[in-house]
Regions:
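Extended, charged catalytic domains and RNA/DNA-binding interfaces, predominantly
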Residues: 1-167
């Protein structure tokens, strides 16, 4: 289409969280979704051909009895990861399709705690919506500074660089 640039990505669903990795080169192998150690998982996703950005999606949702930013894994005051290892994802979803069912500002508070802790993590809008009959669609957008005079020919590498730089 002449109206947008397509980018291949993958939502990596694990027992310890949901992540998006992008861009991924066509016909790349699938990431190992059975990894539960985040350091190993981040390394495996970043090893995929073309990947420049990894996002943590819906971090307050329960994933098989694991909540990525739950009190046993995350200090919401200090922004510390209680697992001991630093966070290495590039962005945090701060508006989710389920946000209207809970404290809509909780993820913003979490994100600011991470920033205050010293992490350079971008905030993103909704990563996905699974159920159009229960959740509000299109409630958030993520904007990235990038030349866009030719929407079908966006420089994806530059857009990803600006994304990671929180621009």
């Amino acid at each position: 289409s002449r109206h947008f640039t397509t980018v291949i990505g993958n939502e990596v669903t694990t027992t310890t969280g949901h992540f998006n990795a992008f861009p991924i080169e066509l016909d790349s192998p699938l990431p190992n979704h059975e990894l539960s150690d985040w350091a190993q998982l981040m390394q495996a996703m970043r090893a995929l051909p073309g990947v420049r950005v990894i996002t943590l999606n819906h971090p307050r949702d329960d994933h098989t009895s694991f909540t990525p930013l739950g009190p046993e894994h995350f200090n919401p005051v200090s922004g510390a990861h209680l697992g001991g290892k630093p966070y290495t994802f590039d962005a945090l979803e701060v508006v989710t399709s389920a946000a209207m069912q809970s404290d809509i500002m909780q993820l913003y508070h979490d994100w600011f705690a991470m920033l205050n802790h010293g992490y350079r993590i971008a905030a993103i809008g909704s990563s996905d919506t699974h159920d159009v009959s229960r959740f509000i669609l299109g409630q958030a957008r993520t904007y990235v500074v990038c030349p866009d005079a030719a929407p079908a020919d966006i420089d994806v590498a530059r857009a990803c660089e600006n994304f990671r730089s929180m621009r």
